[in-house]
């Protein structure tokens, strides 16, 4: 189960216990429990509507009505505002990417506030995403889907956050771009970033994740390490249809 999958070398940085969340009167999360350790890539897997994105938004403080416990580096952030959570070193890259269409690539990169020391410089961003340097003066609407995703990830790397939450970063992208995103995540992990990933593309997730949690109907129903993947393929087929 999920508790057994949590044994890794890094210290715990995020602990979520009995997380409940609502959109208006709609009760979406029904007691989510999971943790993330330093330097890991942890993936939340599940079908559409399972509650994965709501979980990320709750951690980020975007969902107004939420209860339970969310602790980051030992600090209780359950009821903190999004700006205070960002200053703790957490960044969220939404599925819709949020690129400002009227701004060019440079302006999009310079817009986010630096919330902590250690944010990537433009030169470091261009080393990670060479395409963005080539499109520096292009408007957001002129970028391909893959370039928009690169820009969305690059923007949160500018903030100084070391805990990244990526929501469906491969959605709608060509296989060659998905591979590039995978290489980027692996490189960020090697540089000490901790990543919480939401994915439906299990085959992609299996190339980058250290651990998995399965989310269904607003609850974590299972969890295992990447080393246990082959032993859990039947379960994954049942849960996800992969």
Go through each PLM region and give its residues:
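Glycine-rich phosphate-binding loops of nucleotide-dependent enzymes
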Residues: 2-242
């Amino acid at each position: 189960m999920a508790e057994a999958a949590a044994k890794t070398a890094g210290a715990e940085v995020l602990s979520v216990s009995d997380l409940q969340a609502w959109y208006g009167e709609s009760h979406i999360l029904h007691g989510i429990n999971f943790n993330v350790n330093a330097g890991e890539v942890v993936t939340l897997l599940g079908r559409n509507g399972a509650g994965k994105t709501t979980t990320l938004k709750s951690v980020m403080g975007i969902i107004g009505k939420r209860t339970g416990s969310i602790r980051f580096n030992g600090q209780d952030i359950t009821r903190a505002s999004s700006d205070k959570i960002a200053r703790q070193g957490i960044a969220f890259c939404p599925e819709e990417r949020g690129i400002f269409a009227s701004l060019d690539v440079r302006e999009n990169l310079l817009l986010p506030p630096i919330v902590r020391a250690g944010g990537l410089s433009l030169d470091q961003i261009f080393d990670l995403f060479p395409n963005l340097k080539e499109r520096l003066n292009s408007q957001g609407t002129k970028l391909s889907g893959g370039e928009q995703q690169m820009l969305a990830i690059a923007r949160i790397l500018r903030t100084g956050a070391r805990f990244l939450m990526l929501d469906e970063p491969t959605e709608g992208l060509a296989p060659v771009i998905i591979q590039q995103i995978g290489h980027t995540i692996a490189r960020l992990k090697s540089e000490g970033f901790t990543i919480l990933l939401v994915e439906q593309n299990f085959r992609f997730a299996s190339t980058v994740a250290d651990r998995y949690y399965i989310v269904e109907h607003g609850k974590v129903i299972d969890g295992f390490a990447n080393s246990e993947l082959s032993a859990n393929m039947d379960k994954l087929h049942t849960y996800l249809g992969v």
